[in-house]
Structure formats: structure tokens, C-alpha cells
């Protein structure tokens, strides 16, 4: 086998396997990172596909079958990555339109694109660049129960009094910590926001509503200490991913929360419906996750299931809400985000729903990817419009 063909197969076969996951049911958890990488980094995979085709293009009468294998892999890579890439421009335009309409409906001027205005190919290649951000790690936020809660504080490089964003991590309420999304947090700080990312007690040792109480500990710390750190305690947003988004929404729904804006990425919506119909595929074993978090089954704890469901806290106005869901999310389907948006708006809450068609659950684990950059752009724009003065 000649060297060119060998390299083409070494590149083409595993890349084809990775990208094939993007169009398959996610039966096992290991498939999710592959699906995220395959879509978020699609332009890089497209280049790989073109290289594979270029290497295998030269005719080789001795290795004809292997040559066709390599060309087939290259074609699959180009097609599978291209299906994501072609949807980027209309998705970006639709997201901008949804943001502008949502902000205007809320009575806020649509802020101009800020630090992250467009999709940046260099960022896609080398990652987010935030060299001048100072992070205070392991700050004591307070005690909840018998557990000392800690947080990381990301300081903007600019002088002045900055809006504050409380970041709540995901992880199915049983894993994860405040370091989640640290590159995204640094990017928000670089855009002029003081970011506080806090821990909370985890299931199954601690059941709901312990986690909600822990978020309140972080909120009290922010109100007490933000001014001394260059933050404005009168301009607080709360943001979470997945499990953290559920906690963010419930925190904002509390009476006199003092929160000015809330952002949820792929938030759980209705634990009752999720228990009754976990859906398929179910790589997380949703009922086991709910049992671990809530402390029992729906039959045993029906009121707790309802109380933990954001859908049941939509009947009165909340602060302006930004929801971001992936159209390819097989853990928390887009239809739940659409239902939550409808109910929030019906209850008088100004709500912006951004849909990213190719995005999987936790797509922003690659914050410099296609969906990650789009989400960062929209989050910055939303926070700027709501919080900046």
C-alpha cells in the first residue's frame, strides 16, 4: 500500500465513524462527545474529508479496492460535515432575528453585536482567547447544611462597576462542579461581566430542594460582596446548563428574587412528563436520574416532582428569559423548550428562544465550536441589552 493511500485510510476511517454518530440514535453516553465534536467542529472535519479525497484521488490499479474505500470515506466526511455547515448561516440569521424581536417585545433596545459579533474561523481553530482575565478560585460562598460551598470569581479587565452573572453548573444534579464552562466564563468576563460560578450539594446524598437552597447562598454572597469586587448587586443575571438551568429558572421564579435576567441552556422542563415518558433513546436512564435527585418515584413524591418542574413556575412574570436548545438534543428534546417558551410567554414573561438545529446536549462543551460561538454571541447580546446601563 502506498503512503498516500495509507494516510488517507488512517484519516478517513476513524473520522467517518465519528461523524456517523451525528446521524445515529445516541444509545450510549460515549456517543455524545463524538456527536458534539462531529457537529461543533464540522468545518475542520470538512477539511479532513477534502484531504482524504485528495490523497486517494490518484489512480492505483494495484490497490483499487482500498482506493475506493478511502474515496468513500472522504465523500462521507464531506457530506456529514457539510450538512451542519450549510445550516449555519440561516441559523445565525434566525437567532439574531429572534433576539431582536424578543428584546423589543421586552421593551429593551436590541444591543449591537459586542465582543463576539460573528463566527470567527480562527477561534474555531485555536479556541477562545481571553488572556487578561483574573480568576479568584475557591472563594468561600457560605455554608449550606454542613457543607462549605465555594465559588470561582472571574473579573473583567475593564475598570468600573459591572453586571454580575451567577453561573450554575450541570451534571444531572449528581456530578459536575464550578469549573464547568470555565472558558465560557472567561469570555463573559472579557465582555465586561463579573462572573461567579458556584458549587452546590449533589445527589443522591442531597435531594431537591437542597440544591436550590445552595444557589440562594451564592446569591446572598453576591449581594454582600459584589460591590467590593467591582460588581453591581442591583444587576444580577443567573445562568445554568441542563441541571443548572433548572435551578436557574426556579431561582428566578422565587418571589422578590432580585434577579434581572435568567439564561437556560437545554433546561429540563417537566419531571412529571419525563418520568411518565422517558423517551427513546435514554442513555442517561432518566428515571434513575430523577429518583436520585428528587429522592423517590413520582408515585412516592408527586408534589416534589411538580415543584421541581420549571413548567409549573410560569404562571406569573419572571425576569426576561433566554432559552437555548439544540435541535438534535436527544436527552432534552427541543419540543420541551418550545413548550416552556409558550408557557412563559403566556404567563407574561419576556422570553427569547434560540434553536441550534445541529446542536446536541452540552454542545457548548466546545465553546469555540459553531454552536458555542453562536450561543456566546447571543448570551452577550442578551445580557448587554438587559443589564448594561
What does each of the following model-derived ranges do?
Residues 103-118, 249-303:
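Hydrolase active-site cap/lid region
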Residues 179-197:
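Short amphipathic alpha-helix adjacent to the substrate-entry channel of hydrolases
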Residues 207-226, 375:
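Alpha/beta-hydrolase active-site loop
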Residues 223-238:
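Gly/Ser-rich "nucleophile elbow"/oxyanion-hole loop immediately N-terminal to the catalytic nucleophile
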Residues 317, 323-325, 329:
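Short beta-strand/loop motif that positions the catalytic acidic residue
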Amino acid at each position: 500500500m502506498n503512503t498516500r493511500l495509507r494516510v488517507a485510510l488512517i484519516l478517513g476511517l476513524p473520522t467517518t465513524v465519528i461523524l456517523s454518530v451525528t446521524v445515529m440514535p445516541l444509545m450510549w453516553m460515549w456517543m455524545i462527545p463524538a456527536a458534539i465534536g462531529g457537529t461543533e467542529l464540522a468545518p475542520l472535519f470538512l477539511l479532513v474529508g477534502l484531504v482524504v479525497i485528495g490523497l486517494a484521488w490518484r489512480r492505483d490499479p494495484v490497490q483499487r479496492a482500498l482506493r475506493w474505500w478511502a474515496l468513500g470515506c472522504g465523500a462521507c466526511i464531506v457530506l456529514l460535515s457539510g450538512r451542519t455547515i450549510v445550516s449555519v448561516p440561516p441559523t445565525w440569521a434566525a437567532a439574531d432575528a429572534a433576539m431582536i424581536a424578543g428584546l423589543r417585545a421586552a421593551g429593551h433596545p436590541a444591543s449591537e453585536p459586542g465582543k463576539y459579533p460573528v463566527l470567527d474561523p480562527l477561534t474555531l481553530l485555536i479556541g477562545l482567547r481571553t488572556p487578561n482575565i483574573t480568576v479568584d478560585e475557591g472563594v468561600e460562598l457560605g455554608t449550606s447544611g454542613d457543607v462549605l460551598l465555594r465559588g470561582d470569581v472571574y473579573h473583567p479587565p475593564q475598570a468600573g462597576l459591572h453586571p454580575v452573572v451567577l453561573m450554575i453548573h450541570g451534571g444531572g444534579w449528581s456530578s459536575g462542579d464550578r469549573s464547568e464552562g470555565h472558558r465560557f466564563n472567561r469570555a463573559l468576563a472579557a465582555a465586561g461581566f463579573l462572573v461567579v460560578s458556584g458549587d452546590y450539594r449533589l445527589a443522591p446524598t442531597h435531594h431537591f430542594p437542597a440544591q436550590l437552597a445552595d444557589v440562594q447562598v451564592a446569591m446572598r454572597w453576591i449581594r454582600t460582596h459584589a460591590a467590593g469586587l467591582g460588581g453591581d448587586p442591583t444587576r444580577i443575571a443567573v445562568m445554568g446548563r441542563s441541571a443548572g438551568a433548572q435551578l436557574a429558572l426556579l431561582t428566578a421564579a422565587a418571589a422578590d428574587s432580585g434577579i434581572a435576567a435568567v439564561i437556560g441552556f437545554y433546561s429540563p422542563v417537566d419531571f412529571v412528563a419525563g418520568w411518565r415518558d422517558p423517551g427513546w433513546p435514554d442513555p442517561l436512564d432518566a428515571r434513575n436520574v430523577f429518583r436520585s435527585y428528587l429522592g423517590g418515584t413520582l408515585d412516592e413524591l408527586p408534589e416534589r416532582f411538580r415543584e421541581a418542574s420549571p413548567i409549573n413556575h410560569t404562571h406569573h412574570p419572571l425576569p426576561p428569559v433566554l432559552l437555548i436548545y439544540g435541535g438534535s438534543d436527544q436527552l432534552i428534546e427541543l419540543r420541551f423548550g418550545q413548550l416552556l417558551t409558550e408557557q412563559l410567554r403566556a404567563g407574561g414573561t419576556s422570553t427569547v428562544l434560540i434553536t441550534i438545529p445541529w446542536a446536541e446536549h452540552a454542545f457548548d462543551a466546545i465553546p469555540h465550536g459553531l454552536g458555542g460561538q453562536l450561543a456566546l454571541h447571543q448570551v452577550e447580546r442578551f445580557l448587554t441589552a438587559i443589564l448594561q446601563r
